[in-house]
Swiss-Prot record:
Site location (Transition state stabilizer): H182
Binding-site residues, substrate: 8-15, 21-22, 60, 87-90, 98, 114-115, 183-184
UniProt keyword list: Gluconeogenesis, Glycolysis, Isomerase
InterPro entries the record matches: His_Pase_superF_clade-1, His_PPase_superfam, PG/BPGM_mutase_AS, Phosphogly_mut1
Gene Ontology molecular functions: phosphoglycerate mutase activity
The protein's name in its UniProt record: 2,3-bisphosphoglycerate-dependent phosphoglycerate mutase
Organism: Delftia acidovorans (strain DSM 14801 / SPH-1)
Record family assignment: Belongs to the phosphoglycerate mutase family. BPG-dependent PGAM subfamily.
Gene: gpmA
Active site, renumbered: H9, E87
Protein role: Catalyzes the interconversion of 2-phosphoglycerate and 3-phosphoglycerate.
């Protein structure tokens, strides 16, 4: 049996302000730092250890991984960063307040933008200063690979090649793997691993900073999955994520 640990980054400044974040590179709040440290303490207390870590190129996930590994005295572990683990791109909504958008467009429309599988938000214009196409961290990519908006279907298509080419082979080779990423890149992995339907994935929410453990069989098919720590607290945190887009 293999294990995979997934951690959504701790609370970010724009989580706190209830803004659509996407690829905008905001930092952790003090609460987010503490959530990341607590994840590390919890993993250490439960006897977890790792050989290899993966994260995105966005600082809220990277720093979550740092703090988690620091609490485990594993800051020396090899870490692979990939843009493919970035958050879903929220297009023209990036930087806007979710509740304000719900008041303007209605809860149902914001839910579609936030959680629907195949409906992206309005796209950024390529010349919009919020676009990441001129960001040096994506300089090795073809501009067409740097999105101007994404739906979850797009995020799944972006994340799965990295799973298939990097993460899954590492697990199958016997490496103990932790992934620190984002709500929607983790939802993309959850959808794939659990075979969740396009409709059902709308109801899946991932709380900040709580380790999600997958136990996998020899073919990397899930045996079971669970959040470490207080299950009730994890459920409440996931419900709070679900409520962010309401007026």
């Amino acid at each position: 049996m293999y294990k995979l640990v997934l951690i959504r980054h701790g609370e970010s400044t724009w989580n706190l302000e209830n803004r659509f974040t996407g690829w905008t590179d905001v930092d952790l709040t003090a609460t987010g730092v503490e959530q990341a440290k607590n994840a590390g303490r919890l993993l250490k207390a439960e006897g977890y250890d790792f050989d290899l870590a993966y994260t995105s190129v966005l600082k809220r996930a990277t720093r979550t991984l740092w703090h988690t590994l620091d609490e485990m005295d594993r800051t020396w572990l090899p870490v692979q960063h990939s843009w493919r683990l970035n958050e879903r791109h929220y297009g023209g909504l990036q930087g806007l307040n979710k509740a304000d958008m719900a008041k303007q467009y209605g809860d149902a429309q914001v839910l579609v933008w936030r959680r629907s599988y195949d409906t992206p938000p309005p796209a950024l214009e390529p010349q919009d200063p919020r676009s990441e196409r001129s960001d040096v961290r994506y300089a090795q990519l073809d501009p067409s690979q740097v999105p101007l908006t994404e739906c979850l279907k797009d995020t799944v298509a972006r994340v799965l090649p990295f799973w298939n080419e990097s993460i899954a082979p590492a697990i199958l080779s016997g490496k103990r793997v932790v992934v620190a990423a984002h709500g929607n890149s983790i939802r993309a992995l959850i959808k794939y691993l659990d075979g969740i339907s396009d409709d059902a994935i709308v109801g899946v929410n991932v709380p900040n900073g709580i380790p999600l453990v997958y136990e996998l069989d020899a073919n990397l098919k899930p045996i079971r999955h669970y959040y470490l720590g207080d299950a009730e607290a994890a459920a409440k945190a996931a419900a709070a994520v679900a409520a962010q887009g309401k007026a």
